[in-house]
Amino acid sequence: VLADALLKETGLSKLYERSDANVRQLEGLEAATGWLRGGPAAGQPEPPLELTIHEHDWRLTLNIAEGHKTGFYLDQRDSRKRFADCVQRLNLRKVLNCFCYTGGFSVAALAGMRAAEQAGGQGGGVVTSIDSSGPALERARAHVLLNGFNMAQAQFMDADVNASLRQFLKDGVRFDAIVLDPPKFAPTAAHADRAARAYKDINRLALQLLEPGGVLFTFSCSGGISADLFHKIVASAGADAGVDGYITERLGGAPDHPMTLEFPEGEYLKGLVVMRKA
């Protein structure tokens, strides 16, 4: 019934199910993937699983069967645009994207740099993207090319984020802007204490790596971490880092990710924009 209603409402003809998240096991549900509607007829080839999508003025690709969740984190759509605008407005030229996956925030940063240059700002700039998934980084590289950006402005590191942040700090490397968009550290409230320590550690390192006046876009996608707790974690990270800063904006899921009144845990995605005091 829901599948038919979705197709009727959107006017689309195909629907692919990705009910394969680990949380289904906690609820005693079996994993299910495949075509719900519009799949191949007998003897016919399967419809394409590789898609090109448009977000703002950018083109991005995904594989609906193999990528994380839907293949691309659609809930961060508005935050990526906010980041691009921030990079352009402040003419930020040294950007670090941690847990970059397929480079959504990296594309946003490069778009902001290009817009700043076209508006008369200083050209150049480099976006460094870190992830531990080789295939994700390959797609991130492809996204840079797909959008016509200069590959000389894009660096990619197949590495552990925590170790990389510590090495940057040791080497005296600093950045104008940093994105922390890690995977889910706390799937439930039972994991909150351990997750809080992990969030605090990476935020402390990121704040130490920011240039004075630099900007941190930091996120938690853990339902077990409330927005209030996340604020406290980041504030504590700043205190431990010896960094003074301001929260200039709170971020969350895009408007097409609503939350019900009776289920506050549905606000799984929360973000803060922190500017280090100059």
What is each of the regions a protein language model found here?
Residues 175-205:
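Mobile active-site "lid"/loop adjacent to the S-adenosyl-L-methionine
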Residues 114, 210-212:
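Helix-to-beta-strand junctions that scaffold the AdoMet/dcAdoMet cofactor pocket
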Residues 102-124:
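Conserved SAM-binding loop of SAM-dependent methyltransferases across substrates and taxa
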Residues 2-72, 81:
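Non-catalytic substrate-recognition/targeting regions of SAM-dependent transferases
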Residues 95, 117, 123-131:
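Short beta-strand element of Class I
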Residues 90-101:
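Conserved class I S-adenosyl-L-methionine
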Residues 169, 201, 215-278:
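C-terminal catalytic and target-recognition region of SAM-dependent MTase-like enzymes
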Residues 135-179:
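S-adenosyl-L-methionine
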